[in-house]
Amino acid sequence: MDPVRNPYAPGAGQRPPELAGRGRELDVFDVVLERIARGRPERSLMLTGLRGVGKTVLLNTLRSQAINHLWGTGKIEARPDQSLRRPVAAALHMAVRELAPRHRAPDRIDAFLGVLKAFAQRAATAGRGGAAPKLRDRWQPGIDVPASSGRADSGDIEIDLVELLTDAAAVATDVGTGIAIFIDEMQDLGAEDVSALCAACHELSQLGAPLIVVGAGLPHLPAVLSAAKSYSERLFRYQRIDRLDRIAADQALCAPAEREQVEYEQKALDLLYEKSGGYPYFVQAYGKATWDHAPRSPITAADVRVAAPEAEAELAVGFFGSRFERATPAEREYMRAMATLALVDGEEGGRDDMDAAVPTAEIARALGRKPASLSPARDALIKKGLIYSGERGTVAFTVPHFGRYLRTQPA
């Protein structure tokens, strides 16, 4: 098989050649866009799921849908060490610039940009806790109009964000369209920023304003939002993004191959689904390796067996190993105990991926430690995005098959 023609694309946020199994999510978002365009009330959208299920790819695809509906859009990636103020200002600047050529009153655009500049510069005047800002935070937006005063510049992120997004929505109303802000890795926002974002979305929904937030994050994102505002459970539409079913996984492999006049034998598809578990990133990784090793079409199960070790070696280094290396020895000990217990619980529950959620009390018992003494390791792993707590008193891996990987590594 010609490696130059290999259609598969395992990569972080890289769109696969065939976006299989996400038709429902795309259809739902089309309805959201149309309803808002007609003045109907709609909720902002939150996508949740493990790493490797294609949340970022789907987020980018939804943004393309919004652009096709002539919406203004902006996208940011949340980081645990960065305030929301600066990136959201940049995202809104981009969104309004997309709408500006269709606005009949340039003065209205300039007025909003003045508010936006004041909002952005407020972040540059003082760091968190009133300390002087770091050099990297002394950012000036590329806005030519002077900063306004008395709007979105109080220094209270919740007050300022409500005012800023309300003004941005008014600009979209003037144009007869909407604005969508896309936020990836949303679970990494600070508590104050999450609270401010919830408050802003609440205000926008009450006004029926044409501005929505589309967030993507790990499975515990709903809990993060709920901890910030009790009404967040009713404020957002939540969509769990999971692994592909068998039909969708076969489509993700076969459709790109057919465009290159290549076919798969059924037993090859059976084995590929067994190896990948239906997780989109793994489907692409195994598909790419199999293509490169297959001598001819149709691709056989023997080709998959030959290629699988290469795919697994690449995943072990780039997908699993890079995350494992970020953990301290104490954190690795914690995860190894998790992996062992997850296997037992997964077998008892009939789980074929064998990475079930594990009670923290059982981890402490397995390590012969008091639960309180393990809290620093658990909290650090959650902060690093390696595990999450979906329910009180339990933890699970954020990466599919991570427990399986750990169980193959020497202690």
Residues covered by each model-derived region:
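Short regulatory helix/loop adjacent to the ATP-binding pocket of P-loop NTPases
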Residues: 220-236
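Conserved small helical "lid"/interfacial subdomain of P-loop NTPases
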Residues: 241-268, 275, 286
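Walker A/P-loop nucleotide-binding motif
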Residues: 41-61, 367
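Short amphipathic alpha-helical interaction segments
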Residues: 191-192, 357, 367-384, 392
